[in-house]
Amino acid sequence: MAHTNTSTALHEQENFLPKNRLLLVILTLGTVLFVINIDHNGLSTLLPTIAEDLGAQKSITWAGSSQLIATTVFSVLYGRLSDIFGRKALFVSALGVFSIAELGCGFANSPRMLYAMRALTGASGGGIGNLSIIIATDVVSLRHRGQYMAVVAPFMVLGNVCGPLVAAGVAKSSLTWRGLFWLISPLGGLSAILAGYILPSTAPTDTFKQNLAKVDWLGSLTSTVAIVGFMVAVSGTGTYHPGYSPLAISLLSVSGAAFLAFLFIEWKFATLPIIPLTIFAIPDVSALLMQTFTLGWVNQANVYFIPIYAQNLRQWSPVISGVLLFPIIAVQVIVSMIAGRWMSKSGQYGTTIRLGVAFLLIGSLLETQFGRSTHPAYVVIVLLVIGIGVGAANQPMVIAMQAHTKKSERAVVTSSRNFFRFLGSACGVAMSAAILQSTLRASLPVAYKHLAESPYALAGLSPQERDVIAPSYERAIRHVFIASAGASVLCSLGLFVWKDDGYESRPNEDNDNDQHASTRETDEEDEQSTLIDNREPSAVSYGTVEAGERDRYKAPDRLRRGL
């Protein structure tokens, strides 16, 4: 194998900050994610208007699909690239590209240009989300990570809520739909300036040319081909082509071949693999990645199909169907903050994950009983249960993976986690759509079988016609929820694989000979601000501190003993 010692090939970027400066960094990350989520959730509101303006009624879904595919592709790459080129430089660069892409969306005069710009938005936006978690990993001790990362959650939810409202307001103005992108572009630019000023930075020790030589180019190429082929095949199933079409089979074949090549390259040739295969040799991490995939499946399937259930089967208004998602979103924030606080105080992450998965399983099983006559209160309660499950398990799974890996691998394991989450979301929506359509094709009366081609084709039907097709839709939606329940069962099985060792016992640290290795994070039982109180003024700067000095500043008990 061509692998080198990762810890020696990469420069140290961990830089714990004093509490006031740490809070400023976390708030900056939250502000950036607020802007990103306005864009992500505002687009769907504008799709009908954009389709009419650009004459793209048949292909407008690619505005979202191109972004999702690019996000998934680049979510794999950013972790290792940030190890090589530095977190801050890559983060600010991604924000700059995001701003340019948003501007391009606003000036798009054809569907192809719009889709290309949305892909660029996804490539940069996915990296921003990834790097936000990785930067938080660098500046917050492992034990307190959940607590501070939960501070970011309200910003993301606020962006989710404001996105559709801002989009609707701008669309009615003289700026039309283009105004949303013209608004977000300067906000992204300002966010880049803010991040460049506030975020800590540890400059790479090697030259740019030397860093370029470290990049796993073959691994990046083969992973991109594998992911794009798979995502295009899955995203288009039932919409642009049937799952058994020659196009789908060809895409999946190319994707499979590229995936095998990627595994071989990462195993035999890559000096700094973008995904070290060694992380999959850790059963705990593999199980957590599987749980992340299934969690993404269940969550995204609900976000996509609950409105379809509400509008097509229950004949509720679009406003009501949108409000139904609020319990899932709102409770996730509250529970995520509670879970983060609990992990910091208890020193354990397993309890919150187990409770979250249990709630997810119970909620998903109860959801299979949704039908035409289900009481609205039952629907809301079940969605609250699912939201509690997602909120309690989502972020703690990140902390759990980081606790089971070396420090040098935490950036790539974070990227891998986000990749599996995006992949699970995409597969959840695509497979659920295929289940919905296949069930409708099999059960709809002959005169209405064409309705299986589009979940939004019911708008022009009379109440009498809706009553005729309602049993078929009820059966199809139930099958979708049964598939989500199956994913939840699979997620629960992962609980029997990994164990909670806390934050203090990690024998696989990069430097086993370092006397302070085990002390650095066990001493975090004191608040992080206490760790900083003993630092000299120069030690709290954003610059690099010598390794020996840094160890001293992170071990206050040793300082008290006169180290």
Curated annotation (Swiss-Prot):
Q: Which SUPFAM superfamilies match?
A: MFS general substrate transporter
Give start-end positions of Basic and acidic residues composition bias: 504-521, 547-563
Chain segments annotated as transmembrane: 22-42, 59-79, 89-109, 120-140, 150-170, 179-199, 217-237, 247-267, 269-289, 319-339, 346-366, 379-399, 419-441, 479-499
State the residue spans of region: Disordered.
504-563
- Keyword Electron transport, does the record have it? no
Please name the Pfam families in this protein's record.
MFS_1
Entry's Gene Ontology cellular component terms: plasma membrane
Membrane topology of the entry? Multi-pass membrane protein
UniProt cross-references to InterPro entries, sorted A to Z:
MFS (IPR011701), MFS_dom (IPR020846), MFS_trans_sf (IPR036259)
- GO MF terms on file? transmembrane transporter activity
The primary site where this protein sits is membrane
Glycan-modified residues: N5
- Name where it's found: Membrane
Q: Which UniProt keywords apply?
A: Glycoprotein, Membrane, Transmembrane, Transmembrane helix, Transport
**Key word Glycoprotein present in the record?**
yes
Please indicate which superkingdom the organism of origin belongs to. Eukaryota
Do you know what upregulates this one?
A: Expression is induced on squalestatin S1-producing YMG medium.
Report the sequence similarity comment from the record: Belongs to the major facilitator superfamily. TCR/Tet family.
**What does this chain do?**
MFS-type transporter; part of the gene cluster that mediates the biosynthesis of squalestatin S1 (SQS1, also known as zaragozic acid A), a heavily oxidized fungal polyketide that offers potent cholesterol lowering activity by targeting squalene synthase (SS).
Name listed for the protein in its UniProt record: MFS-type transporter M2
Q: Which organism is it from?
A: Phoma sp. (strain ATCC 20986 / MF5453)
**Source organism phylogeny:** Eukaryota, Fungi, Dikarya, Ascomycota, Pezizomycotina
- Identify the gene encoding this protein: M2
